[in-house]
From Swiss-Prot:
Name this polypeptide is given: Small ribosomal subunit protein bS20
Gene: rpsT
Family indicated by similarity: Belongs to the bacterial ribosomal protein bS20 family.
Keywords on record: Ribonucleoprotein, Ribosomal protein, RNA-binding, rRNA-binding
InterPro entries linked to this entry: Ribosomal_bS20, Ribosomal_bS20_sf
Stated role: Binds directly to 16S ribosomal RNA.
Amino acid sequence: MANIKSQIKRIGTNKKAQERNKAVKSELKTAIRSVKTAISAGDKDAAVKAVSLAGKKLDKAASKGVIHKNQAANRKGAIAKQVAKIG
């Protein structure tokens, strides 16, 4: 345990940020999972809507610093490519 007052405060701040980041990452996984289920079902309309929502969540996470902007771009591109393959 830290002895310095500022470090004790920092531990609490870091814990809050960690919980917030974990929640955002969980939302991202859920959004991407919904895209993949729509793709596997072959439902193009649902997949397009899910990609839109997932892209929004990825951009938001990147702007908040939860994930890197390049990682967000790569994930968006990957799921968009998969949706484009649906006939």
